[in-house]
Amino acid sequence: MESEAVIAQGGLERIGIPGSRLKLVDSKGEKVTIEKDIAGHEEGISLILSVLTDEKLGCIKAYNEIDAVGHRVVHGGEKFASSVLIDDEVLAKIVECCELAPLHNPANLEGIYAMQKILPGTPQVAVFDTAFHQTMPDYAYMYGLPYELYQKYGVRRYGFHGTSHRYVSRRACEILNVPYEKQRIITAHIGNGGSITAIQNGKSVDTSMGLTPVEGLLMGTRCGDIDPGVLTFIMNKEGLNADKVSNLINKDSGVLGISGVSSDMRELEIAVKEGNPRAIIAMSMYGYRIKKYVGAYAAAMGGVDILVFTGGVGENQTSMRKAVCQNMEYIGIHLDHAINDTIQGKEMVISTPESKVTVIVVPTDEEYVIASDTQDILGNQV
């Protein structure tokens, strides 16, 4: 982009439920919170636009200064392998993908519809979480289920956090001044939700999340990898239906379910230091699962050149990065503990000069990717 300055940032929380608020950083860099009941997305976007044009808090004078709008859309299925300009056909395909992401795509659509109503005629672009992973080979994305289920319902691995994995992998190569298309990269986006991706020669070749964001790593409230037979066993024992099982594995499991303390890794770390035995188990499981995926993806790619940590935990929790890299010298990972212990939330190489694998922290910036893709697509339409 010609100009890459951030002129406004913020987000709406708790839309449609009590306690909704808009958090933003004003033009002076001060954090501001506006408490206001927000019934739906249209009302929320109207509030955002009123703030953007506010004389004191805003950065533009009128809505017509907005050239385009970029949207994050969680699931594009096999229909989208890149970001696209939104039209009626694209909207129809996003609607078709709602059954694959019933918790996310409908909300994404609400934002698009609201913006179309408030800013009619303004170009809008959809940037899909799943698009980056559409380069996976079939043997990586297929499940060992009857092939007809893939043909009828699209049951396969799709992966998520693609916008983040794309950004941090490219940014790491820019920092290291190495060609993106010639690297074997493992990106670890770890936080309350988390996923790991193997990127070989500039393409995603495998990723830990699956048909849904539940598969893979142990997360804040999601169980991650689990024997499917466990679910039918629990359904029979507890008398649970499909909706209750979905709630169990999405909202009641993960480090929260194991520890009984919190889904927040910062609070879990405090509990570990206090000697809470269940918190210790949860923390150990969290790191162990990440380590296993790093080893698996190194095997899948025949080695690894760069390991990237990002996400809330990856960027800030030094102890977790240490735990993941411990005893990984056999594949060429040598952590510089003195540097690692001081790095939080900023770009930095945290491996030793002798390390065959470069380990680097790269704060993610999905909003930049959305803005960049929107600019690129808008430019192509002119």
What do these predicted regions represent?
Residues 1-39, 210:
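Short glycine-rich, Thr/Ser-proximal phosphate-binding strand/loop in the N-terminal lobe
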Residues 51-66, 172-179, 294-305:
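Phosphate/pyrophosphate-binding loops at sites that engage ATP/ADP/AMP, CoA/4′-phosphopantetheine
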Residues 52-104, 125, 131-140:
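Short beta-strand-loop/turn "lid" adjacent to the catalytic site in phosphate-handling enzymes
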Residues 71-74, 190-193, 304, 308-316:
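Glycine-rich beta-strand-to-loop/alpha-helix junction loops that act as flexible
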Residues 200, 205-241, 247, 311-342:
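Catalytic phosphate/nucleotide-handling subdomain of diverse soluble enzymes
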Residues 247, 254-258, 265-300:
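Adenine-nucleotide phosphate-binding core of ATP-dependent small-molecule kinases
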Residues 280, 284-308, 314-382:
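Internal helix-turn-beta structural module
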